[in-house]
Each structure stands twice: as C-alpha cells, then as structure tokens.
Regions:
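Short, glycine-/small- and polar/acidic-enriched structural segments
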Residues: 39-168, 179, 195-199, 214-218, ...
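Conserved C-terminal helix/tail region of periplasmic/extracytoplasmic solute-binding proteins
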Residues: 305-324
C-alpha cells in the first residue's frame, strides 16, 4: 500500500470536461488499464482520488490495511478532480477514480466506457454557495447575472446552482460560471473577480473563518436528494477483474462504516493527505457517506443535465452501474 504525490497541478486552470474527453476519444482508443489481470482479480490497482474530507474512506482503507486484507495491493494517487481524472482512467493510469457524477455522465454520454462501481458522498450541508459578508446578494435568484466560481465548469456544483435558480424563478442561463481551484476562490471573491463561490468542506469552514457567509446550501429543495460523487472504473476492467471490483466496493463500504461520524478519526487522518489543519477538520460539517451505488440518483442527475444543456439529449444511465 502506498500513496503517490499528486500528478496534476490543482492550482492550474484546466480545459472543460468535454474537451478533455474529446481528446481521450481520439488518443486512447485501445488503451489497457493499469493493473488488470485476466483471472478476475487484479494483481495491483491504482486509485485516483481528490484530497478532500469526502475521500477519507479510501485513504483510511489503505492506511489501516483494509484493502490489503481484501487481497488488493493498492497505490493511491491524488488527482485534480474527477473531470481531469477520467481521461487518466481511460488512458490506463488508474483502475478506479473518484469523480462527481456529472463528469461521469458526460463521459459516458460521449462514448467513454465508464461504469460506477461504488458510491461515496451524498449532497449535504458540507457544500454551499458563499459570498462576502458585505455582498449585495441575499437569495438564490440574485445570482442571475452574477459570476460564480466553481472548481469545474461542468460539474455537480454548476448543475445544482442551475436547478436551484430555476426553482427560484431565475434564469440559470444568465449565470457566468468561472473555473477556479477551491483554495484560491476565497481570494478571488475578496478581490471582486467573482461574486459568489461554490465551497465544499474543508474549504467551507475555512471560508467561514475568513468572514465569508453562506448564501444558500447547494443541496436543498430541488437538489436535496442528489448523489454527489462516487467511484468509477472502465467497462473492460470491471469485466476482466470482477473479484477486484467486488473487493474494492466491499472494502470501501467497510471503511465508510468505520469513518462515518467518527470526527476524532478524521481529525487525525485528513491532515495527513490534505493541507488542512486538524483544527479546521474539527469544525467541518461532516460529509454524508454512502458507498452503495445509487441508480435512481444517477438517473435524476442525468435528467437535470439534459434539462440544463450539459448533455445534448436524454441519456439512459442504466448501463453505467456495475453492482451486484
């Protein structure tokens, strides 16, 4: 078991998900996976994860030997987020990656063979749209015509904002979403480069400490039941390594059970793989974890994506789920 330094610069701007996927479709046809074995169990597996509080279960499973106990030789790699991790998955750099479901659906809709093998986190109070304390914005409809910082242009954050604005009677098409890494959004907000920002723990707690305020929770009302992110692999890897997939999913579920509601564990663990202090972790809103894939939630996400133009037409997500 090991953790490998970050492969992608989380502070640099990245191209939109669709552009990255288009490049993958052209460049990686026929590529294999990193650790697959034809006998149904991978000799070793590479896992790409974004370093957040939300990915504590996968790190915990590695650090405590849960993966090893399940027969998996795991190597963890940090990524710059799901939209950037998916091309690396298809290119064979990883066997499993953590991604938001919007990026996963976009990939599948454009023909990439990605499948969801496990859930991870569900929308809760750990996500929020935030503004400065002296902001003139006071309700969701006020974002009409505003500039909002998000960590990826085609992501669950922009999708949820669009759904909430529509529910409030505003036009989400008039929101200007700007792509920025989470750690620099606060400075951009203070400098007036953006009017509001999407923050997720532990950055939400840090923003509150800096004096910023929650304009509205991101997952409420029309977005209250949305799953946020989970774990995907390629169809080839899932078909060729069913034992590895089952072991990964079962181990993640065990780890979620151990991590869930154990703040002391998180206070000790999260600072080891993020730049977040134990003091901040002690104050964060706890994520809501669920390792089970959510077919209905994924379908609802795809329906919203079609409504707001993230995909061109209705998309059946049934074949995206690889679960018992």
């Amino acid at each position: 078991m090991s953790r490998v330094p970050e492969r992608a610069d989380g502070r640099s701007r990245v191209t939109a998900t669709t552009a990255a996927i288009a490049a993958v479709l052209l460049a990686t046809a026929g590529c294999g996976t990193a650790g697959g074995a034809a006998d149904g169990a991978a000799d070793s597996v590479g896992i790409g994860y974004f370093p957040l509080v939300h990915t504590a279960p996968v790190v915990h499973a590695d650090e405590t030997g849960l993966f090893a106990d399940a027969g998996l030789d795991v190597e963890l790699h940090t990524t710059a987020g799901g939209a950037q991790a998916i091309p690396s998955l298809i290119a064979g750099e990883y066997d499993f990656v953590y991604t938001n479901y919007v990026s996963a659906v976009i990939a599948a809709e454009q023909g990439l063979p990605v499948v969801v093998v496990a859930g991870n986190d569900v929308g809760a109070d750990d996500h929020a749209i935030m503004v400065t304390a002296d902001s003139p914005l006071s309700e969701p409809a006020d974002l009409e015509g505003a500039t909002v910082g998000v960590n990826s242009l085609q992501n669950v954050g922009s999708l949820a904002v669009s759904a909430i604005l529509e529910d409030a009677g505003a036009d989400p098409g008039l929101v200007d979403f700007v792509e920025l890494p989470y750690p620099v959004m606060g400075a951009a907000l203070e400098q007036g480069e953006i009017d509001a920002m999407w923050q997720v723990e532990p950055f939400t707690t840090g923003a509150l400490a800096d004096g910023h305020e929650v304009l509205f929770p991101l997952f409420d009302g029309p977005t209250g039941d949305l799953p946020v992110a989970g774990w995907i692999t390629t169809r080839d890897f899932a078909d060729e390594n069913p034992e590895a997939v089952d072991a990964f999913r079962d181990t993640l579920s065990t780890s979620v059970d151990q991590v869930r509601d154990d703040r002391d564990l998180l206070v000790d663990l999260v600072p080891t793989y993020t730049e977040v202090s134990a003091e901040v972790v002690a104050e964060v809103a706890m994520p809501v974890w669920d390792a089970a894939p959510d077919p209905e939630g994924l379908a609802a996400t795809a329906d919203l994506m079609e409504r707001f133009g993230l995909i061109g037409e209705a998309f059946d997500t049934t074949e995206m789920i690889d679960a018992p």
